[in-house]
């Protein structure tokens, strides 16, 4: 019960997106993955949610990769391991069943990082 209370009392950590005429906050734990398409950065969220912003990936890359569980799988994608349900040889599958590619040169590193994250997460519980 104490662990549940601590979780509920803990403020949610959020990423702030600077959109035209407004600021939008996204809890980090709601992000499945981030994808850049053209000049638009798409934040794919749990339950098939999405927030988009006109910005390069590099504007948010450091903020994401500095957090535990975030990993760059490809020049256009960053995943949140917390919200990945499956890892295939070349793809992560998110909780919302969306496919996220893994660059050929990063497959072993992605697998190792994902397994390490899963074991570290289990140790925290």
What is the meaning of each model-derived region?
Residues 1-95:
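Conserved binding/recognition cores within well-folded domains
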Residues 1-14, 101, 115-125:
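Inter-domain helical "communication" segments and dimerization helices
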Residues 60, 109-110:
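DNA major-groove recognition helices of helix-turn-helix
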Residues 98, 108-109, 115:
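Hydrophobic helical membrane-anchoring modules
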